[in-house]
Amino acid sequence: MLLGVNIDHIATLRQARYATMLDSFNVEPSVLDAAYAAQRGGADSITLHVRGDRRHMQDADALSVRESVALPLNLEMGNTPEMVDFALRLKPDYICMVPEKREEITTEGGLDAVFHEKDLAPTMARMADNGIQVSLFIDPEVPQVEAAARLGAPMIELHTGCFANHSGRERTEELARLKRAAELAHSLGIQVNAGHGINYQNLEQLLAGVPYLHELNIGHTIVSRALFVGMEQAVREMRQAIDRLS
């Protein structure tokens, strides 16, 4: 199973101090150094989200990681003309289409692929024409998986936030939803990834309950752990946990 490391919150920390002076010589922490550390720790890919409001990752961050880090790059992005143009300039290995709300702290739910199907189709076609694979970040619901299949998405990322944020019976119900969605996607020939809220504590339950997972995209818990053990070691611990449990 592959581990994609999301390094957005390295940029979040940097922006807390240097948002208005990114050209300063002493800006820290370095997004590029975090990507290198993730690579040394065993990451299989780097994920970053360039949001429309540029609240954390900047265009220059994505471009520097793409140019310098020898790992596949996954760009999370909203389906806007601006971001489509940027993705075509960046040429990541793949993109993950996500919803965006300016008032949210982080992405709060999956993209409604059913509602936005007509808007997504031309974007996905443009990306395919440029050799960029497209994933859709969706809630684990049958209609969403079916919409992804109609759009010809080669992969999806199941939103695991509800699983992560609940316990007891509600978490069991979320696991069942994830399992059904993963099984359906697999039967339709769609690669199944997962992300949002996955941490060192809930990883075992997720992997035991959801089949056919190909890649996990994990960020906040790794960056949080890195505050105490360093980025490379935090990634290594997650890599070892995935290898042990999968």
Curated annotation (Swiss-Prot):
UniProt KW keywords: Cytoplasm, Pyridoxine biosynthesis, Transferase
GO biological process entries: pyridoxine biosynthetic process
One Gene Ontology term, aspect cellular component: cytosol
InterPro entries recorded: Aldolase_TIM (IPR013785), PyrdxlP_synth_PdxJ (IPR004569), Pyridoxine-5'_phos_synth (IPR036130)
Enzyme class, UniProt record, top EC level: transferase
EC number in record: 2.6.99.2
CDD domains named among the record's database cross-references: PNPsynthase
Compartments where located: Cytoplasm
Main location: cytoplasm
Amino-acid positions noted as binding 3-amino-2-oxopropyl phosphate in the UniProt annotation, renumbered to this chain: 6, 17, 197, 219-220
Catalytic activity: 3-amino-2-oxopropyl phosphate + 1-deoxy-D-xylulose 5-phosphate = pyridoxine 5'-phosphate + phosphate + 2 H2O + H(+)
Site label Transition state stabilizer, positions: 157
Coiled coil regions, renumbered to chain: none
Record-annotated active site: 49, 76, 196
GO molecular function: pyridoxine 5'-phosphate synthase activity
Sequence positions that bind 1-deoxy-D-xylulose 5-phosphate: 8-9, 51, 56, 106
Pfam family, any one: PdxJ
Listed pathway(s): Cofactor biosynthesis; pyridoxine 5'-phosphate biosynthesis; pyridoxine 5'-phosphate from D-erythrose 4-phosphate: step 5/5
Family to which the UniProt record says this protein belongs: Belongs to the PNP synthase family.
Subunit (UniProt): Homooctamer; tetramer of dimers.
Its biological purpose: Catalyzes the complicated ring closure reaction between the two acyclic compounds 1-deoxy-D-xylulose-5-phosphate (DXP) and 3-amino-2-oxopropyl phosphate (1-amino-acetone-3-phosphate or AAP) to form pyridoxine 5'-phosphate (PNP) and inorganic phosphate.
UniProt-recorded name of the protein: Pyridoxine 5'-phosphate synthase
Organism of this sequence: Akkermansia muciniphila (strain ATCC BAA-835 / DSM 22959 / JCM 33894 / BCRC 81048 / CCUG 64013 / CIP 107961 / Muc)
